[in-house]
Structure formats: C-alpha cells, structure tokens
Amino acid sequence: MIVIIDYDTGNTKSISKALDFIGLQNKISSNHAEILQADGVILPGVGAFPEAMQELGRRGLDVTLKEMAESGKPMLGVCLGMQLLLESSDEHLFTKGLGLIPGHVEKLPDEPGFAVPHMGWNQLEIKRSTPLTKKLGGEYVYYVHSYYANCPNEYIIATSGYSVEVPSMINKGNIYGAQFHPEKSGQIGLEILKGFKEVTESCKSSQQ
C-alpha cells in the first residue's frame, strides 16, 4: 500500500489515478499511523514552499515523513513535493525544508527566451541509472514550476535544460524526487511510477 500524503496542497487525485492504472494499491491520507504502516509514500505539492511546510508542520506530517524516511521505506516527492525534500528554499522568504536530501531551492533565472514559470514539455537527460530511470532515454516530461532544486551532483539522477540545468530527478537512498509531473507525462511518467513500484516491492521483500 502506497500512501499519497494529503495536506491540502497537492494533485493527489491525479497521482492516485496513475497509480491505479499501473496496479499499485494506494490511498490518500494524512493519518500518521497509516503513513508509517505504508510500504512507501508519495509527497505531492502544488503552490508555494513556505505555505506547504507550514501546513505539513501544522499537521505534524513533517515529523512523520522524517520518521518514514529514517525507516528506509521509499518516498517520492513530486513537483513542490520534491523541493520540500531539500534543506531549504528562498521562495518568498527563507524557509527550512524536510532536509532529507542536501540542497536548496532557488528561483529559475528570468532570461530572454525562458519564461518563468516554466510550463510545458522538456527533454530528460539521464545522469544515473536507478529503478526509476533505467528505462528512460531522452523522453519529454511535463513541467510547471518557477523554482528549482540546487543540489550536489551526486544526488541528481536526471536533468533538463532551461535557463539553467534543472535537476529533473533526485535520489538519496530510497528517497526520490521528480520536479516534473509523472502523472501528467503520459506513458513515460507511468514508467517512472512503475520504477517506484519496483522500489517499494523490493524494499518490502527485504524487510520481511
């Protein structure tokens, strides 16, 4: 069972439908016990970093997610959810993140020919093979964002070119992040979610 974190700031239903499509049992929940009992979690996110962290904190979900990560169970952050995995952000004001992956969130440079927010399809360049990236090449995925994750290269598993080289996917241990929306990226997005399914099943088997 995968729990999609419900904190009133995410595209939970579209992610749930995508997981249903690939046969991955899931539920949308903010219940601490359900989250900790899950085989893995997906942290969605749409909106601003400070408000999202405030809402996670108000519900005590920041502590729950850190406990989940410490257990070694898989986690996938999507769009803003990926950014929340990092240590901090400059969006509107300096705000601490969950600190699960080293890095800082910065605004995309507003340069001629590169609109901010970045909305639309962009090509992936795979930097490292993982269960989520092993079937990917130069496919296009769908983005909607104004900020990006500035993190050490060792945690970047895919990028896309824009006004800067945007870390498209990041990874540390069983924690993954996707800056784009897999649930809106067609078949290639489903392949990424299948990779996360593989990680959760492998982790579950090793813990039994």
Curated annotation (Swiss-Prot):
Subcellular compartments: Cytoplasm
Question: Where does the Glutamine amidotransferase type-1 domain lie?
Answer: 1-206
Catalytic site: C79, H181, E183
Q: Which InterPro entries match?
A: Class_I_gatase-like, GATASE, Imidazole-glycPsynth_HisH
Q: Which CDD domains match?
A: GATase1_IGP_Synthase
Q: Which reaction does it catalyse?
A: 5-[(5-phospho-1-deoxy-D-ribulos-1-ylimino)methylamino]-1-(5-phospho-beta-D-ribosyl)imidazole-4-carboxamide + L-glutamine = D-erythro-1-(imidazol-4-yl)glycerol 3-phosphate + 5-amino-1-(5-phospho-beta-D-ribosyl)imidazole-4-carboxamide + L-glutamate + H(+); L-glutamine + H2O = L-glutamate + NH4(+)
Q: Name one Pfam family in it.
A: GATase
**Listed PROSITE patterns:** GATASE_TYPE_1
Q: Identify the metabolic or biological route this protein is part of.
A: Amino-acid biosynthesis; L-histidine biosynthesis; L-histidine from 5-phospho-alpha-D-ribose 1-diphosphate: step 5/9
- Is the keyword Hydrolase assigned to this protein? yes
What keywords are assigned to this protein?
Amino-acid biosynthesis, Cytoplasm, Glutamine amidotransferase, Histidine biosynthesis, Hydrolase, Lyase
Q: Name one GO biological process term.
A: L-histidine biosynthetic process
One GO cellular component term of this record is: cytoplasm
Gene Ontology terms, MF aspect: glutaminase activity; imidazoleglycerol-phosphate synthase activity; lyase activity
**EC number(s) in its UniProt entry?**
4.3.2.10, 3.5.1.2
Q: Per its UniProt record, what Gene3D superfamilies does this chain match?
A: 3.40.50.880
Main location (coarse class): cytoplasm
Q: What job does the chain carry out?
A: IGPS catalyzes the conversion of PRFAR and glutamine to IGP, AICAR and glutamate. The HisH subunit catalyzes the hydrolysis of glutamine to glutamate and ammonia as part of the synthesis of IGP and AICAR. The resulting ammonia molecule is channeled to the active site of HisF.
Complexes and interactors: Heterodimer of HisH and HisF.
What is the protein's given name?
Imidazole glycerol phosphate synthase subunit HisH
The gene is: hisH
